[in-house]
Amino acid sequence: MRQSACINTLIRRRDNASEPKITDSISPKEASPTLLSRLGFLVALGFLRLTSVLPLRLLHWIGGGLGWLFAVIPNRSAATTRRNIAACFPALSSAEQESLARQSLKGMVCTGLEMGKAWILPIEGTLAQVTEVEGLAALQAVAKAGEGVILLAPHLGNWEIFGYFACEGIASNFMYQPPKNPQMDALLRGVRAKSGIQLAPTNRKGVAILLGALQKGELVGVLPDQVPNDEGGVYADFFGESAFTMTLISRLAQRGTPRVFYGFAQRLPKGKGFKVIVH
């Protein structure tokens, strides 16, 4: 299912309140985790471990049921999804828009259920989730030639599995905004470490790290559909809306002559894994 997870999130419009500033640290504020945060982490970890061993086909079946619940029970994600689809696809009938919204909500839930495969399995198990590949050879050839590469990985399909597979064997650098829970942050750092991906903070220092990586001929990964901080974006027309859009990619692309690719991991039917597609 190709629907983007970002269609389930609110586009930052001109009339929205300002987003919080990005801090100068890659780590969450130093604080002892509370009992509630520890319990929350243990529940999340148990969930991830369970879903890491369940078959994809079963996870997608469960995702279909939970996605249906998200569609019929009033909630913010469903309302936002319908609003965004109406703005992006005004020519579709109400029934067609609703069908697309339900597919998107199902995809959103399936992505959450798949994270155990991305975060808990050994890297070999994560990479084995990919069963089909299209267009990756061109990216690998450029990267191995020592040319700088900018890889855009939007919230489409399963972006975590895509990132690990596309960057396997390539010196790679990604920006990372840590979660508030320090234990979850430690888990995710370990996940990135197993793949060899280097992390850059989401601030000026991080931008400098990415620029340096491009100059060394390495790969830089960016999730282009994230809402930037106040200093990192401009308002641009997007399906009739004035949406706050990051400028980082254009800034990176103007430094030197990096090659720009984008891609995603498409969810295959019947739990047959993922197809990595790169353009």
Map each language-model feature to its residues.
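Membrane-anchoring hydrophobic helices of lipid-metabolizing enzymes
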Residues: 11-153, 185-187, 194-196
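Soluble catalytic domains of membrane acyltransferases
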Residues: 111, 116-279
